[in-house]
Amino acid sequence: MANGEWRIESPFRDPPAYQARGSDPLAEQIDWYLSPEHRADIEHGCPNTGFAGDVRRLDPAGHARYAQGLAANLDRFAQIAQAPGLQEGERRARAIALFSEMAGALLLSRADADPALADEILDSARTDVHSRTGAA
């Protein structure tokens, strides 16, 4: 993250642009987030997984900034992870559960020294999240 902004293209950043070009922003977000490329690019990747283990040691201002960023990410994810018939609270709960699975898989994949297992973690989570969301 540079100056608080991601440098890599992500459907999180501009869902309407992905929809305008005929893409499913949820499917693209899942595929991008749970990719070996994102796993390898720690410096420019998701700050939620990059700083999660250290955030409690930050001063109150740093902790507040992390919390604001996480809330913003969850809000963006809830926008692209909509499902018919869900109320606002249900949509947010669904987004939190899905994003938590994705972040946990990315974190575990980054921590594992065995490349085959690291890939298996990403592949399993990607398949599960796609099946639970119906994302293409």
Regions found by a protein language model. Give the residues of each.
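Short alpha-helical scaffolding segments that buttress acidic/His motifs in well-ordered protein cores
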Residues: 29, 33, 48-52, 98-102
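Alpha-helical scaffold segments in soluble metabolic enzymes
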Residues: 32, 50, 76, 107, ...
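Amphipathic alpha-helical segments used for helix-helix packing
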Residues: 25-28, 40-67
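Hydrophobic/aromatic-rich alpha-helical bundle segments in the mid-to-C-terminal region
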Residues: 24, 59-68, 81-136
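Hydrophobic alpha-helical connector segments
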Residues: 6, 10-45, 88
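HTH DNA-binding helix-turn interface
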Residues: 1-5
